[in-house]
Amino acid sequence: MKANRLATALASLLLCSAPAFAATPPSSSASASSASTGSDSAPTESLTERLMKPLSSVTTGTVTVEGKAISYKAVAGTLVIDGTGAKESTPEVAMSYFAYFKQGVDPSKRPITFIYNGGPGSSTVWLHMGAWGPKRVVTNDDTHTPAAPYQLVNNDYSLLDASDVVFIDMPGTGFGRLLPQGKDDAARAADRKELIKKIWGVDGDAHAFSRFITQFLSKYNRWNSPKYLFGESYGTTRSAVLAGILEEQDNIDLNGVILLSQILNFGTSIDGPQGDPGNDLPYVLALPTYSATAWYHHKLPKYDGEKLGQLLKDSVEFA
């Protein structure tokens, strides 16, 4: 059912390994329709000069989800994010995105979900090409994916039947760039250092995302759409900060926030607890999840059948 797509899709998350994206994949069934830069660009313009204008390329395609074909418009582009205060009219960063819009529906009633990976320092290629986009990279299982060639296939688990999706790359990743200003190389290098200090931090990162989202909503006239955030790993930390900024400073009431592989407290992460000797919380908190995983794979005969609830209770008490 469409109402359950965001929730049920979580259980079907496809795991992808980094080498799967090391080479250029084969072309998909999407067909190019137009490309624009926001204004004519002279051939002599530098990359930085071009990125100071919003860029976009539009294609169309079809994805099949749960047996139903969904026609969509895809936009690959950048938005230019200006500074604040005295620099509110000065470009600071170009953030890249890939947006997919279902065609033939009223966009004002259509949910829109802003999706991003974490790192911090990662683009959103993983959730885009491995989980929720209309196409996905084929992986045989959840182990290391062999070398090229790789194949793109229809993604049966795409969220496009339930929501339009926008995959956002954090500043400095994907096709985005920091945009240092200055009359010469030394001035630009100094400004770049200031931008790094400002943007590559918890608050600066979240503020950049908030300005991206508000600009995106205006550009595509989606202010009346139900709005969701979907963050993975460090992206869940970003969501916690970003949701507050959107509500308190931008007057945007979100309809929901989805946290995947949450890392709101790094002190309780089971990924590398040996780096914090004496802190046993990661082991204590992970035991119920490990127990449930073992139960799913039928490794605990005592709890086979409908005994998951009892297993979790016993795991919590033991932990």
Predicted segments with their positions:
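N-terminal cap/lid subdomain of alpha/beta-hydrolase-fold enzymes
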Residues: 33-45, 86-194
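Gram-negative bacterial Sec-dependent N-terminal signal peptides
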Residues: 3-21
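Alpha/beta-hydrolase active-site loop
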Residues: 160-163, 170, 197-218
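Alpha/beta-hydrolase fold nucleophile elbow
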Residues: 222-234
